[in-house]
């Protein structure tokens, strides 16, 4: 393969490098694991490295952390949960110092708590109001790493599945770090953390080569990487082969899709969600329909306040008056449609903890009855929320709020 890392290096040499870094100090490792091809490769290489060590040399803990934004594509969330369970079981079986964890945003700062509870407009396609990434993914992972630092009482090394070929922006950051000519680099935001990118030199083809050709595509924790290939292929509408021939005889590997949040409005089209649907996962159609509807109401003045949450009026560079958060009408409507979609799918799209957080936000900010949310939930699902009987009619009954719509 042209430009392959393995043209001049062997897999054994790569694992030896990882072993060298592991044994060089007593700093615990934290691996960011998304379930995608790159992070899976990192976890697989590290796991194999540990298996090759004598038990007495496995002298420090390795924490594998996955991030669940609570709005993950259901297929990806199910797969990731399965992999985390298998990893934990296999590590116990093999006596490895591996601990796996799944982090989520706190219920009162989740996507739905901010959109439905506080009325945050959904993130823009141009990225000017992309409030979600830090709250849903970066902060929960960062807080987890900080807890590891505090509990271990020492610095940590964070392993990432970043590669040179991934993007121009990432390439700039990687090459900038290489100027220091060392394997470990200071973490950009966490003071007592370093970063190690073990597969930085691997191409996409190299990654698939590791995943599919080593041990017949079986992971050390008992899964089959062909399942991962199927996920990528389905996300590409089922038309993505492992390696397809391009013009000039070059090959392009399957697996360039990214699995984002199913309700993400930063992109005009969710290619992976639509790809899954085209590949036969028609159970996801309600998600695509809800996402399209949510995008359609974002900039409709009927559903927006005139002022920002801090009471100021926003004007763009041309002096045009902008909108504030989603108004009460929009928030209640979004919740209704989300619950209806959840009923159709038979899959949890919003947790009870998030609903409780939204209930409390509405009570604090909107001067409305605590009964609004619990009665709406009962109307749509036919079930009572656990705190149904503990909230009182402090203001109006749910149906009496219609005068505000």
Please annotate each region the language model reported.
Residues 1-30, 37-397, 405:
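Nucleotide-activated chemistry modules centered on ATP-dependent adenylation/adenylyltransferase
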